[in-house]
């Protein structure tokens, strides 16, 4: 799975929203691993030229997730999910809807990579909170 985040424009921090696995094919994982990590990972060794970070979370990323591999956020993905829910693990929009909980995308599915966008174009915490509040199942 790949951790996906939203952006806090006030601080530049990225808060996790979900882990995406659905919609990704084996071929995609191989290509993504080669592109981001510089080659296949074996025996937990860091390939030469790897973007892999030695420890996580990546700088500026706020999450309750524990990931085996971390790299600097630089790719924008378009994802779709069933709905948004409050989460003790994911940290996007903490304080905007609930004092301690972030907002998470349930049943996320990868749609496509967005090479035309940068991290500065990622969904903001305010946008995620607005989409959460707009759901019909959320009490107003």
Question: What is each of the regions a protein language model found here?
Answer:
Residues 1-9:
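Catalytic nucleophile-His microenvironment captured as a short glycine-rich beta-strand/loop
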Residues 11-140:
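Intrinsically disordered, low-complexity regulatory tails
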């Amino acid at each position: 799975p790949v951790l996906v985040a939203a952006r806090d424009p006030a601080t530049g921090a990225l808060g996790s929203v979900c882990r995406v696995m659905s919609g990704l094919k084996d071929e995609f994982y191989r290509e993504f691993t080669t592109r981001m990590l510089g080659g296949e990972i074996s025996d937990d060794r860091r390939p030469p030229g790897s973007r892999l970070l030695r420890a996580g979370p990546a700088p500026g990323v706020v999450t309750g997730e524990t990931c085996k591999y971390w790299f600097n956020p630089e790719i924008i993905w378009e994802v779709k999910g069933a709905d948004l829910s409050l989460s003790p693990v994911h940290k996007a929009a903490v304080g905007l809807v609930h004092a301690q909980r972030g907002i998470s995308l349930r049943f996320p599915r990868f749609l496509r990579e967005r090479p035309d966008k940068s991290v500065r174009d990622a969904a903001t915490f305010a946008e995620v909170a607005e989409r959460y509040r707009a759901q019909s199942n959320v009490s107003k």
